């Protein structure tokens, strides 16, 4: 009986390892110490945070804090839009890419937005 339990335990441990080792990484980008997934549409790139992002918005007595999953839209014409930060711009350079808004900047150091089959569209938005 004990030998069967050891065999079962070993088998479950191996299966657990294999199941995590074979899962592809969906959140491939890191910006502002958060994990982001990247997808593309006809307008450009879409980055979605894996977990809620907490941001402080300074406005004197009317300052506020948000805590939610964010979506960043990086357009082909170098415009940027965010579900929490509003409108801005973005650009790419050898050191990575970033989106800049009125009160916040989200940087993705040493990374490049690339969508399968689209080539290097980010080069049009050089800093």
Features from the language model and the residues they span:
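Lipid interaction determinants
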Residues: 22-127
């Amino acid at each position: 009986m004990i030998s069967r339990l050891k065999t079962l335990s070993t088998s479950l441990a191996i299966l657990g390892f294999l199941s995590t080792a074979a899962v592809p990484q969906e959140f491939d980008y890191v910006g502002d110490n958060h994990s982001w997934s990247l997808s593309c549409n006809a307008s450009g790139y879409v980055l979605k945070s894996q977990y809620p992002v907490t941001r402080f918005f300074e406005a004197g007595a009317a300052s506020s804090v948000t805590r939610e999953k964010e979506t960043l839209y990086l357009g082909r014409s170098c415009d940027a839009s965010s579900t929490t930060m509003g409108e801005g711009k973005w650009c790419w350079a050898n050191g990575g890419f970033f989106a800049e808004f009125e009160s916040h900047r989200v940087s993705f150091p040493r990374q490049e937005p690339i969508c399968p089959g689209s080539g290097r569209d980010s080069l049009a938005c050089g800093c």
